[in-house]
Amino acid sequence: MRKQRAGLPPDARADPEHYRSRASHETYRELGERARDELARTGGAIVDATFRRREDRDAFTAAVGQGARSPVFIECRAPRDVLRERARRRESDPRSVSDATVDLVDRQLDEWDSLDEVDAARHATVRADRDPPDIVDDIEAFLDQRTASGVLRFG
């Protein structure tokens, strides 16, 4: 989304300025609008973003709207050294389209705002330093539990 908003091709590296506060606010607002439209069209949407600042989450949530279709936040956590190593691998891979650098990872972790404002029924934390199938299993279990309890509705 950031690259699209900046008029960059998907395989270009975005300038760090595209990750600053004002640009992020607008990006998250637009992500929320797109998620809202997708929810109306298909009944579901998955948005992959850091949501590291409360103001970004607020912009996204305001654009999506409230009610049974309010956002659910899945917080994927991993140790700093794991995230830094992943960024190093992406930086050295000429085929990578990721903007992640070790400096960006460090800055984002240092600027992290906890999700205190998010209702526990709409927030799960999963360890992201495991095999992907295990992570997916945890996310599915969380969503299944919330759907069964009526917190979430799909379709």
Predicted features and spans:
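Loop/turn-to-beta-strand initiation segments
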Residues: 41-45, 70-72
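Conserved nucleotide-binding/hydrolysis micro-motifs of P-loop NTPases
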Residues: 1, 51-52, 77-83, 130-132
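Short, hinge-like loop/turn segments at secondary-structure boundaries
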Residues: 8-14, 64, 90-93
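Hydrophobic helix-cap positions at the C-terminus of alpha-helices
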Residues: 38, 63-67, 115, 146
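Short, electropositive alpha-helical surface patch
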Residues: 53-68
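Conserved phosphate-donor/acceptor-positioning beta-strand/loop module used by diverse small-molecule
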Residues: 67-88, 126
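Small-molecule kinase domains that catalyze NTP-dependent phosphoryl transfer to phosphate-bearing small molecules
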Residues: 92-155
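Conserved substrate/cofactor phosphate-moiety recognition/catalytic segment
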Residues: 1-43
